[in-house]
């Protein structure tokens, strides 16, 4: 939200469309969007995530490492105050992180092997909360799931080339890592 608000204070134009094709031209790229709009640019920056369409269309190869784990994510609310403190616990079979969004709301990232993750994602919200309260040692009072619960596979990806003539990949389009260290966003900011 903050990034979109910052964008509105600049001369940058936000176009809600997906990348259909790119074509290298003498001094940059010609880009075609799925709304049939064509754009020409001198520098194409792919900042479009781990499954980067820019990287794919540019033909940039990448390596992958499958961690055989999933990240389970959701938002929760609590009866206690998170006190603006991020909290992480390393369990024998998983890692749970609590990332405050406000005094009483937080985002959960629970990294677990595929088998445990499938078990957790199949639980009712009530049973999921019980497991989460145990995993967080009941530090945050009574928890309640405040969003849908999602999961996604944890796969490290690294582009063979981050830069080509008139093109650069940044953030997860260039490299993404396990969320354990919480450094993905920092790496992306460093790229920019």
What label would you give each PLM region?
Residues 1-19:
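Helical element adjacent to the flavin cofactor pocket in flavoenzyme catalytic cores
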Residues 13-14, 25, 34-40:
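Glycine-rich phosphate-binding loop signature in dinucleotide/nucleotide-binding domains
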Residues 15-29:
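A conserved short coil-to-beta-strand element within the FAD-binding core of flavoproteins
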Residues 30, 37, 44-149:
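Conserved FAD-binding catalytic core of PHBH/FMO-like flavoproteins
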Residues 40-42, 164-165:
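Active-site acidic short loop of glycosyltransferases
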Residues 118-187:
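FAD/FMN-dependent oxidoreductases across multiple families
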Residues 189-192:
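Internal hydrophobic alpha-helix adjacent to the cofactor/substrate pocket in enzyme cavities
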């Amino acid at each position: 939200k903050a990034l979109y608000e910052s964008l509105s204070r600049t001369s940058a134009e936000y176009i809600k469309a997906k990348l259909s094709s790119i074509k290298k031209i003498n001094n940059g790229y010609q880009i075609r969007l799925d709304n049939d709009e064509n754009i020409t640019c001198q520098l194409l920056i792919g900042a479009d995530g781990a499954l980067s369409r820019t990287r794919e269309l540019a033909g940039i190869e990448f390596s992958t490492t499958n961690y055989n784990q999933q990240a389970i994510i959701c938002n929760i609310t609590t009866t206690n105050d998170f006190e603006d403190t991020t909290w992480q616990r390393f369990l024998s079979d998983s890692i749970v992180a609590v990332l405050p969004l406000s005094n009483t709301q937080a985002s959960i990232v629970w990294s677990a092997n595929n088998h445990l993750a499938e078990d957790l994602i199949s639980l009712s919200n009530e049973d999921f909360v019980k497991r989460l309260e145990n995993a967080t040692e009941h530090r945050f009072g009574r928890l309640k799931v405040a969003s849908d619960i999602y999961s996604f596979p944890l796969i490290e990806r690294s582009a063979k080339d981050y830069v080509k003539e008139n093109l650069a990949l940044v953030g997860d389009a260039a490299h993404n890592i396990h969320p354990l260290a919480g450094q993905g966003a920092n790496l992306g900011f460093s790229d920019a």
